[in-house]
């Protein structure tokens, strides 16, 4: 009965780890989805600019949930082929996560620069595009910033600084890409830590499971 207990215990531990991977992936998905939903409020003036880590972790998070379910089925049903596919897929997802987190850590100012360029271009259409004006007003009020300057139209009419750029008699002097980047960096930093920490856990799990796969499927449960 000792062999049977060892096999059952090992299988249960691996199943537990896969359940934890599902929970972890849901957490990663949450931190990847929330900022993207928020940035949709400014989708037009940002022209879809967003940190690449957000859509990537959403994809890998969803992918890992499926992979973990496949692993659980493989462990419960004794499917060696399923478990092998599970290990390979998990390693691929882990490599993608760690690579993305590394690049995001290196290119910390990438979104700041791109957002600044796009917002400056979009601000020129503030008085020409109602939708742009609405999104800029929301951004100004939310982040206490201003990206629209005094401007003369083709007819020589002076466009004053928008009311959304003011607070009482004071004007917001800060460019909007800076507070927007601060908001985005909060989620990026969390995702970087999560990707590294849980990425290494998944990598260790994958290597351990790979080395133990023969033991999992070769031991036979004695008949009582």
Curated annotation (Swiss-Prot):
On whether Transmembrane is a keyword of this UniProt record, the answer is yes
Q: Which domain of life is it from?
A: Eukaryota
GO cellular component term of the entry, any = membrane
Q: Which residues lie on this side of the membrane: Cytoplasmic?
A: 1-12, 74-80, 211-224
Instruction: List the ranges whose topology is Extracellular.
Output: 34-52, 102-189
What is the membrane topology here?
Multi-pass membrane protein
- Cellular compartments annotated: Membrane
Sorted keywords for this record are: Glycoprotein, Membrane, Transmembrane, Transmembrane helix
Record keyword Metal-binding present: no
* Record-stated family: Belongs to the tetraspanin (TM4SF) family.
Listed name of the protein: 25 kDa integral membrane protein
What organism does this protein naturally occur in? Answer: Schistosoma japonicum
Q: What is the lineage of its organism?
A: Eukaryota, Metazoa, Spiralia, Lophotrochozoa, Platyhelminthes
